[in-house]
Amino acid sequence: VNAIPSAPTVDPSNTTQYCLGATASSMSAVSISGYTLKWYDNADNLLATGSTGPVPSTVASGSTTYKVTQTNGTTLCESSALLVTVTVNALPSISVVGGASQTVCDGSSITLNGDGGVSYSWSGVDASGNAISNGASFVPPGSTTTTYTVTGTDGNGCSNTSSINVISTALPTINAGSDVEICAGETVTLSGSGAGSGGSYSWSGGISDGVSFTPTVTTTYTLTGTDANGCTGTDQVTVTVNAIPSAPTVDPSNTTQY
């Protein structure tokens, strides 16, 4: 009666994990000298013989169980099987908080955050050419669209990516009009331009765009124009109020007889 050999040992362990789509290595085991290793699938189909086992597939996520035995080269007695589990982990679903596109005004800062992982790294640079990082405010290059890509890694060490287009738009060129001179008591109407369709205007001094008013003293008014993207620009106009001169006097008087 020949003894049944002990099960082989697997290097590095009998549990191996990969990320979906990763390049897998062939399984390996250590046998007793003079013994032959045999590799089986979970249905006991022979896959390979020798110290180098099959290469696990990583095309689908999930766990697969393999079996490995060792056979005495003399007695041909085969050991019990050592179970080897290979787990293929799905890639994390990584996204950018706020969506795939965001618009900012030239010179304004933005903060980008990844979602779906436990750690993140970003590609792309700010307006000064410095690398950006997750959750850190930065100013993107002006008047252009820049694509930033985040790589998110989950707790299994598996990574995936997502991208966002950051559109930096030029500030509107706001025009408050030419300086105005009026006489005291006269009305004036100030109207701004440059904010474009869907834009709006606000004036200092409590006046309204396009609405006449009667200033009492010379004043410089500041116009703030906001375009459809929420970007703002300013301009100023001075309204000079000239005093009304007094009536002339008549010499010798304003009543004359002939």
Regions from the PLM with identified roles:
Residues 4-13, 91-99, 171-177, 244-252:
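Proline-enriched interdomain boundary motifs that mark the N-terminal boundary
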Residues 31-41, 116-124, 195-205:
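Solvent-exposed loop segments of extracellular immunoglobulin-like
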Residues 49-66, 132-149, 209-222:
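Solvent-exposed segments in extracellular or luminal domains encompassing
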